[in-house]
Amino acid sequence: MIDLSLRPRAWSKVARKANALGPLDGVAEDSANVTARVATAASLATLPIINTKPEGFETRAAAKERCAHKIEILRKGNAQEQLLAEKLGRCRKDDPCNSGACDVCLGNYRLWLYRQSLPIFAARHNWTRASVIPAGFLKAFDGLPNVDLSALASMIDKRLARSSLRKRLAFVGIDISLNLQDNEIVGWQLHLYMLIEGENTLRLQEAIKAAFPPEPTAKVPHKFDEVNDPSNRITYLFKAIFKRRSRYTDANGRPRTKGLPLKDSDLRELLPFLDQHPIGARLILRGIRRNGSRLVIINK
């Protein structure tokens, strides 16, 4: 096991030094070369702790303001929702609530993920982003309380473990949107954003498609692109803001999709669901694991 949680001064500096060590696709190299290069990248990243944030990252004040709006909505709900409002209202910097429904705590978690992922990206420089809407991930409105997020994450992990991509590193985030068609609710759509080690090849795409067959109602169930700097994508993979996705046909007969804010009734279903799971339950790691407050690459 190679500990890659050492804090880099800046992504660009560490990446330049790590890439100077030579090519690595994470699959073809023998284990000795992988271990040596990863260890060297880790030693290059032994720099003072940083306070850097991704460009455009939400401020704590903005997160608190959005959370305050949610608290107002929950206070008008049932007993469970009112208890959640109290929990979120008690959240403090020195005593965080660690709720998956708390914008401030989610922001802290996303920032931790960003910083911990930097040396991993420095060690493995070829990455592909995949957006996946799998069959069976569409849930009825009012049905979120019946979703076992832990079991869902385990299923995603097992599907990747059984695929030809099982030896590659991967970050997988579960996102949630409320889908509408012509202003009629279709349901809660759980979907995946992945950052997976390796170039954006046909082989990688076909492996993802085989592991996650498409949702029949999705217009574009699989989307792939090469990632030059995965550090810019990691926070997008684990989102803190959830939306309605409204599909319609415009005046020219072309299909369109518009992102809209969730309504109060939507939030009263979503927020208790997020609260009942650990804050990192929507994140699946492959070839990487959490060791205390650090992320480490697991050598196999």
Where would I find each of the regions flagged by the language model?
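Right-hand nucleic-acid polymerase module
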Residues: M1-W188, G198-K300
